[in-house]
Amino acid sequence: MDFSIKGCDWSKGEAKGFLTGKSDCIVLGIFEAQTLSGAALDIDTATKGLISRVVKAGDMDGKRGKTLFLHEVSGIGASRVLLVGLGKQDAFNQKAYTDAVTAAWRALLSTKIVQVTFTLAQLPVDERSSDWGVRAAILALRNETYRFTQMKSKPEPASHTLKRVVFSVDPADEKAAKLAVKQAVALANGMDLTRDLGNLPGNVCTPTYLGNTAKKIAKDWGLKAEVLGLKQIQALNMGSFLSVARASVEPPQFIVLHYQGAAAKAAPVVLVGKGITFDTGGISLKPGEAMDEMKYDMCGAGSVLGTMRAVAEMGLKINVVAIVPTCENMPGGNATKPGDIVTSMKGLTIEVLNTDAEGRLILCDALTYAERFKPAAVIDVATLTGACVIALGAHNSGLFSKDDALAGELLDASREANDPAWRMPLDDEYQDQLKSNFADIANIGGRPAGAVTAACFLSRFTDSYPWAHLDIAGTAWKGGAAKGATGRPVPLLAQFLIDRAGQ
């Protein structure tokens, strides 16, 4: 799909090109109380009051998400006009904008329209410029057009015909909007990779498959990939990681992917993604209901790989290292048992009280491995705890960090990217729940504050660098009729790296 930018100040009568240019449809916003947006006012004048008459007749009340097509409109080059309800003008925020553009895309994609002129990006949203509106609109469109059909015997063809979108933006934002297009397309491509990896079944998306995916990203985008096998992992003394992998016939992989966009001596940001390609719970076996969704337990890994692809396509001036420990968590005669004690790469001994608390066991060795890069910051991403889903639901990812500056950067990025996160506590008092009578630390701390104690466990392995943990158990995929991976938190991570790179 082709996206282009055209500057226009509707208030200064600069709309001639939009009024006369050929297009299958021009998209206009209407607020409640019969208030026309700036572009709608100009089109209303050109059509001799048609938009006003439609609104006054009650055919378009401006309620958020409502849409109405007008056909064969005289006075403009477009063959159709799509009116989109924006809701109340004084409540027009990020969510209202996202709802409006999503409704617009759904209406457009249900037609045979090929080329669209899109004016909604110029709407005032929380004092943001129109380049932000362009990026959010492209991501909403790509979200609507995403389909996972590669496992079907007859993949479904695209049902829409949309090929080209022309965005009108404020003239002062034209340069930034062109960059926003590039970033949005790269980000959407990264999210699609993340979704594809998550949606693949566990018999296809194995640890080896993830390793090969990392190698392909490296080959396609000029990165460096290292994929360590069982013997190399053993040589690194990653006893905690290996304790999870031991009962599976699928060999574990330890993936390291390097992107160098800055000087070689510049400290990298390290992203660590949990890569459990299927989680049965091990000997602490999960209930059978909805266990199929445990193929999504590698979404932390998928989001890290998707972010690396997006960063490479954007060409960010920053160094980034991705680390993905990946394996299956299976029961079997060789499986780790509740009560077993294992030794981590750091040398800390861990009493495994529950084998279904395995994500932290593979992440802790990866966090220790990250020390060798002398990182500027380390962010781990994991579908770690059901407790986080209970606490935050499916809207906010859980953010844990003792570093206020790093946490602040991530929260700012989450707001800018419209990929929400909520900071959770990480007080030292919670560490007491992880005490073990027989080892240095237990891998669970009981039912109270389960998401917090999981993060506390990880924090024991992060003394050497600024660190944050994102628990995406509630946000990485949707269940039920809409079952599928979401691609989150790729937007948050990418925005954090964009901000760090100063781009």
Swiss-Prot record:
It is an enzyme of class 3 (hydrolase). It catalyses: Release of an N-terminal amino acid, Xaa-|-Yaa-, in which Xaa is preferably Leu, but may be other amino acids including Pro although not Arg or Lys, and Yaa may be Pro. Amino acid amides and methyl esters are also readily hydrolyzed, but rates on arylamides are exceedingly low; Release of an N-terminal amino acid, preferentially leucine, but not glutamic or aspartic acids. Mn(2+) 1 binds at D279, D356, E358. Its cofactor is Mn(2+). GO terms for molecular function: manganese ion binding; metalloaminopeptidase activity. GO terms for biological process: proteolysis. It comes from the Bacteria. Its EC number is 3.4.11.1, 3.4.11.10. Mn(2+) 2 binds at K274, D279, D297, E358. The active site is at K286, R360. Binds 2 manganese ions per subunit. PANTHER family: CYTOSOL AMINOPEPTIDASE, LEUCINE AMINOPEPTIDASE-RELATED. This is Probable cytosol aminopeptidase. It comes from Burkholderia ambifaria (strain MC40-6).
